[in-house]
């Protein structure tokens, strides 16, 4: 059943022979209108599970940012594609922490 309130049961953590998934499709999330008007910037931290196909199978916000940016990060990261994490050269579901940074230029 895994750790942390049942999140990611069966998923491996990186280390101890488990390699990290590698992003191969990683579009930037759009800004929320509310955050753009407030000139709000920062980073949303997400805990994600990458399945054996390289898809994001589950995720949760670990460090929210607010002003609609958490939702934008979640929507976008769900579309990301990865080269799956490996254990003994075999793809395994892998739990990783990622940061999504919002910056106005």
Regions from the PLM with identified roles:
Residues 2-6, 68, 89:
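Glycine-centered small-residue hotspots that permit tight backbone geometry or close packing
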Residues 31-43, 50-86, 93, 97:
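A short, well-structured alpha-helical segment
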């Amino acid at each position: 059943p895994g750790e942390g309130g049942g999140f990611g049961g069966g998923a491996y953590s990186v280390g101890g022979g488990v390699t990290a998934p590698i992003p191969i499709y990683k579009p930037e999330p759009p800004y929320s209108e509310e955050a753009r008007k407030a000139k709000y910037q920062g980073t949303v931290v997400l805990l994600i599970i990458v399945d054996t196909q390289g898809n994001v199978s589950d995720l949760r916000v670990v460090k929210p940012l607010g002003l609609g940016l958490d939702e934008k990060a979640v929507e976008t990261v769900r579309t990301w594609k990865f080269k799956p994490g490996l254990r003994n050269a075999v793809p395994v579901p892998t739990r990783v922490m990622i940061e999504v940074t919002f910056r106005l230029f």
